[in-house]
Regions:
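N-terminal anchoring/stem segment of glycosyltransferases
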Residues: 1-62, 79-80, 131
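Short, conserved charged micro-motifs
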Residues: 134-135
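GT-A fold catalytic core of metal-dependent nucleotide-sugar glycosyltransferases
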Residues: 43, 50-62, 68-121, 128-129
Length: 135
């Protein structure tokens, strides 16, 4: 099953951003999936509502500042196994995203190109990776 991931850490995004992302994914992804939000918000579990959603504490987040805390998702302590599709909380999904779920094979790492300079830079707002070899 596909793991759809997000990180809601610190004060930048209110819990409603997690709810909105969950709702967009549910509306535009037909592939079987589980939605997992890594957070430090104690009450997020009570605020965000939906089927097949998990709220987890993000490992090692204190070691990374700002958007770099998403690197914790690659740690064995994140307890992820199988295909993963990550979205930043400010991503807007307007149409079907099944192509992201089926992109590549089990060894493929996917990252989007930067809109401003697509020939030079990448943007980690959307990531596709596989943790099949995770413990």
């Amino acid at each position: 099953m596909l793991n759809v991931l997000c990180v809601n850490w610190g004060l930048k995004f209110k819990p409603v951003y997690t709810q909105n992302l969950y709702n967009m994914v549910k509306r535009h992804l037909t592939v079987p999936h589980k939605f997992i939000c890594y957070t430090n918000h104690i009450k997020l579990q009570k605020i965000v509502k939906g089927d097949n959603i998990e709220i987890r504490k993000l490992p090692f987040a204190e070691e990374y500042q700002g958007y770099w805390n998403k690197l914790s998702l690659f740690s064995p302590e994140a307890k992820l196994s199988g295909p993963c599709l990550y979205f930043d909380l400010d991503v807007v999904i307007l149409d079907n995203i099944d192509c992201f779920a089926t992109f590549g094979n089990n060894e493929t790492f996917g990252v989007m190109r930067d809109f401003g300079q697509p020939q030079m830079y990448y943007n980690s707002s959307i990531l596709r990776f596989n943790n099949s070899n995770a413990p």
